[in-house]
Amino acid sequence: MSNDEINQNEEKVKRTPPLPPVPEGMSKKQWKKMCKRQRWEENKAKYNAERRVKKKRLRHERSAKIQEYIDRGEEVPQELIREPRINVNQTDSGIEIILDCSFDELMNDKEIVSLSNQVTRAYSANRRANHFAEIKVAPFDKRLKQRFETTLKNTNYENWNHFKFLPDDKIMFGDEHISKDKIVYLTADTEEKLEKLEPGMRYIVGGIVDKNRYKELCLKKAQKMGIPTRRLPIDEYINLEGRRVLTTTHVVQLMLKYFDDHNWKNAFESVLPPRKLDAEAKSASSSPAPKDT
């Protein structure tokens, strides 16, 4: 270990206060977690201020890089061009996406935070995509609702366009707008591939962050509900190193991107990091009218 690493570790030790005695009837792990949360609440304002300063610095650095390209008369790289927050030229994809958030008791607090962040990113994706979907979070309750009503209250989530929060999961069983035979549950655990997205359909996406702890969770739920299941064509286009499960945000982005040209291959290449794409599958599929969904 270098002297710099030793000094960094020493500084880290100095910054972390010693853990007070563990109260009777509480495990050390629970006490440590509670103290960590308390330190976060006490220093939240400081952390937020540091985050704002960093964000401002990065924004200035990005602007400076863009100006350098302009001054040299060169084309600005795509990665430096920020997408507009709202796409004013959007058209309706004609589909509904339901984020099934009924798995609260299967996630820890950190995973609930991750899920809430994925929901906000799904909303952002729906605002920016060329084709929007009617997205609904159901059921919206327990810790997810609590987080939106507190930490994420300033997002004004109650007024999001094309994005609704429902108190129960009745919508998954069909309603006056869409019958049950027009509903499909998307899960990586089924064998049947989703060939195409069709207007007038309602697609359910499992809203759970579980690091693959619960095998076939969404598949079994869909079977119990009597809802047909399909999987995105992950195996055909990408290599996830053993894990065929995408985040909720990625699934929503892929579905929205699909409507640009109804080509799953292009959607995967556009949404997912290039390092995840399966080179063999990319070269094997180049048909103009893809079966690839």
Curated annotation (Swiss-Prot):
Changing residue 210 to N: Completely abolishes catalytic activity. Residues 32-61 form a coiled coil. The lineage of its organism: Eukaryota, Fungi, Dikarya, Ascomycota, Saccharomycotina. It comes from Saccharomyces cerevisiae (strain ATCC 204508 / S288c). InterPro entries: MT_TRM10-typ, MT_TRM10-typ_sf, TRM10/TRM10A, tRNA_m1G_MeTrfase_euk, tRNA_MeTrfase_TRMD/TRM10. S-adenosyl-L-methionine-dependent guanine N(1)-methyltransferase that catalyzes the formation of N(1)-methylguanine at position 9 (m1G9) in cytoplasmic tRNAs. The active site is at 210 (proton acceptor). It is an enzyme of class 2 (transferase). Pfam families: tRNA_m1G_MT. Monomer. Residues 1-31 are annotated as: Disordered. GO terms for biological process: tRNA methylation; tRNA modification; tRNA N1-guanine methylation. This is tRNA (guanine(9)-N1)-methyltransferase. Its EC number is 2.1.1.221. Changing residue 118 to A: Completely abolishes catalytic activity. GO terms for molecular function: tRNA (guanine) methyltransferase activity; tRNA (guanosine(9)-N1)-methyltransferase activity; tRNA binding. Residues 83-279 form the SAM-dependent MTase TRM10-type domain. Changing residue 212 to A: Has weaker affinity for S-adenosyl-L-methionine and reduces catalytic activity by 90%. Its main location: cytoplasm. Belongs to the class IV-like SAM-binding methyltransferase superfamily. TRM10 family. Changing residue 247 to A: Reduces catalytic activity. It is found in: Cytoplasm; Nucleus. The modification Phosphoserine is found at residue 283.
